Every structure is written in C-alpha cells, then in structure tokens.
C-alpha cells in the first residue's frame, strides 16, 4: 500500500510540474504575440503620420514654386 501511495504522489507531482511548464510556455508565447501586435500598431501609426504629411509637403512645394 505504501508503494501505491508513493507512486500516486510521484504521478501527481510530475503532472503538476508538466502543467506548470506548459502554462509558462503559453504565457511567454502570448506575451511575444502581444508585443508583436503592439509593434505592428506603432508601425501603422507612424505610416499614417507620414501619409498625413504628404498633402502638407505638396502644398509647401507648390507655394515655393509660385514664389520662385
């Protein structure tokens, strides 16, 4: 009976360790995914800012060409 208790304890312990490792890997992959999404959002906002400046640059160039 003592052998069965030790075996059961070992199985439960190894299962918990395995579960803990899997949860940690899942958490790390979710963090990486969130960081990647945040980087993508920042890149898109930078692109939008640059695209918004194009009409301003065109009007500045046309104003300079009218002066010269």
Swiss-Prot record:
Q: Which residues form the propeptide?
A: 23-49
Annotated Gene Ontology cellular components are: extracellular region
Query: Would the keyword Plastid turn up in this protein's UniProt record?
Result: no
Q: Where in the cell is it found?
A: Secreted
- InterPro entries recorded for this chain? Frog_antimicrobial_propeptide (IPR004275)
UniProt signal peptide? 1-22
Q: Which GO terms describe its biological process?
A: defense response to bacterium; defense response to fungus; innate immune response; killing of cells of another organism
List of residues that carry Leucine amide: 67
Extra information: The primary structure of this peptide is identical to that of Medusin-L1 (AC P0DQK9) and of Medusin-AS (AC A0A5Q0MU22).
Query: What family name appears in the similarity comment?
Result: Belongs to the frog skin active peptide (FSAP) family. Medusin subfamily.
What functional role does this protein have? Antimicrobial peptide with activity against Gram-positive bacteria (S.aureus, MIC=8 uM) and fungi (C.albicans, MIC=32 uM). Shows anticancer activities. Shows weak hemolytic activity.
What is the name of the protein in this document? Medusin-C1
Q: Which organism is the protein's source?
A: Agalychnis callidryas
């Amino acid at each position: 009976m003592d052998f069965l208790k030790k075996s059961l304890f070992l199985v439960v312990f190894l299962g918990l360790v395995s579960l803990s490792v899997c949860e940690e890997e899942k958490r790390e992959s979710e963090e990486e995914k969130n960081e990647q999404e945040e980087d993508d959002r920042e890149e898109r906002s930078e692109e939008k800012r640059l695209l918004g400046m194009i009409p301003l640059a065109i009007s500045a160039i046309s104003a300079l060409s009218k002066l010269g």
